[in-house]
Amino acid sequence: MGQLRDRMDADLRLRGLSENTRRLYLRCARDFAAYCGRSPAVVGTEEVRAFLRHLVDTRRAPSTCGVYAAALRFLYDVTLDRPP
């Protein structure tokens, strides 16, 4: 996820997001990539939904699930400029 991570970090910086938010969003993207076993750039909507369901099924707090959803939305809407 090296180049994609760098692009996402640059986009987060351009938006003026705090260091903590940038780290959190990048960690969310990394966790998603690890779950999928491949780059988020080649993953579709069903994998995103499956990952978010996985978070709920593993009893993550609703606020945590919301952060992951926001981070993935940023990744796809801003960095990749495409729907998942």
Q: PLM features: residue spans?
A:
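Intrinsically disordered, low-complexity and often Lys/Arg-enriched segments
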Residues: M1-G2
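N-terminal core-binding DNA-recognition domain of tyrosine recombinases/integrases
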Residues: R5-P84
